[in-house]
Amino acid sequence: AAQLSGDDAAAGKFFHAMAEQSEPETRYLGLHGMLTQAMHEGHQEEALELAKQASELKPKTDTVVETLFDLQVKTGDWLDAEETVKKAVKAKHIGADAGKRRRAVIAYQQSMEAESEGRFDDALGHAKRAVNLAPSFVPAATRYADLLADAGKRRRAVSVIEEAWVRQPHPHLAAAMERLSAGGAEDRLHAMERLAGYNRDHEESHIALARAALSAQRWSEARQHLDIVAGTHPTSRVARLMAELEEGEKSDTEASRNWLKRAATAEPDAAWICESCGNVVAEWEPVCGRCEKFDTYLWMPPPRVSQISQVEENVVQHGVDIGPEIDGDAEHVMPPRSGA
């Protein structure tokens, strides 16, 4: 009653008294009330301690486990967060694959922190563990490869990128391979030919080969691959590459300009987009900087302007809160989830 009437102080005393009781259910309700208050007031360290106590009393309660994990993430308590994930998998709160993914993301974050603190061996070890836990986790593969290259283990770094390409070709993997390629444009083209061979028919393989061929001024090879992916509805990225090809091969300014016009109206290039709030970032992050949700960035195209307008019209008509994110001059609104 005190909480409902807005008397938080009185409610806090009541919850505290309940938490002092020996009867488990009463004590849990008191801890839960105190936890809710601490979170509402932004006292994360206090909330974390209360969540630990609540989880000890009710280790099989999904909401308690998830709250504890969220608080451990927000406070950067990565070691305990991983232990919470292991317990959640054992108690069947989450599946084994989901547990591995969470642990991989935690290992990625630990690798970043270790590198920033100058603990290079630890950074390398955490990155390796992230890749082992989630072999299709592209950011972990690129991080591990870069760290291996820094350690002078270029051949192993190349293998990491190639193994990841088999599972999930991605432009950031191609960029990592470019960084690993010693020499000039011809060497990069040879490296991309080898990489693309592991997933020959994938769109990203054709695009990676086209980019490398353009750099090496192998115009016919570039056109061959771009013709395959251009089709009737090329993405903005492919249209820009076609513009570069027309200018480079034929010095055809008009054709190049026409492709640039198509690029402006084509399907937007994919980006890392938070599935929770729509925040867009250039580099993947374990925790969204806007909504603070864990592992919510997906690689997908942002919505077209027309889609945004339709959603905004729906908001006006029905009062739905979509939580737009403004990044620079562009407003991003989440599209339906299309993949991880």
Q: Model regions: which residues?
A:
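Repeat-based scaffolding regions
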Residues: 1-286, 290, 297-340
